[in-house]
């Protein structure tokens, strides 16, 4: 599969809020993002993102069907 094929099907989303960190060492960020294109335009999703991220960043999502579960409270 070529790289061109992967990016043609991706949908842009803007990061609205960084809600928390997860993962064993906190390397995964949970963010709320707004879909900017496709059939779900305007929908707000919660997603898990690996790597540096901040509010206002544009991320490319391969699919917009799945949503991340809310982070549990620490005891």
From Swiss-Prot:
Keyword line: Ribonucleoprotein, Ribosomal protein
Biological process annotations from GO: maturation of SSU-rRNA; ribosomal small subunit assembly; translation
Name of the protein in its database record: Small ribosomal subunit protein eS28
Pfam families listed in its UniProt record: Ribosomal_S28e (PF01200)
Positions of transmembrane segments: none
Gene Ontology MF term list: structural constituent of ribosome
Gene Ontology CC annotation, any one: cytosolic small ribosomal subunit
The keyword Ribosomal protein belongs to this UniProt entry's keyword annotation: yes
Similarity section: Belongs to the eukaryotic ribosomal protein eS28 family.
Superkingdom of origin: Archaea
Source lineage: Archaea, Methanobacteriati, Methanobacteriota, Methanomada group, Methanococci
NCBIfam families tied to this protein: PRK04007.1 (NF003080)
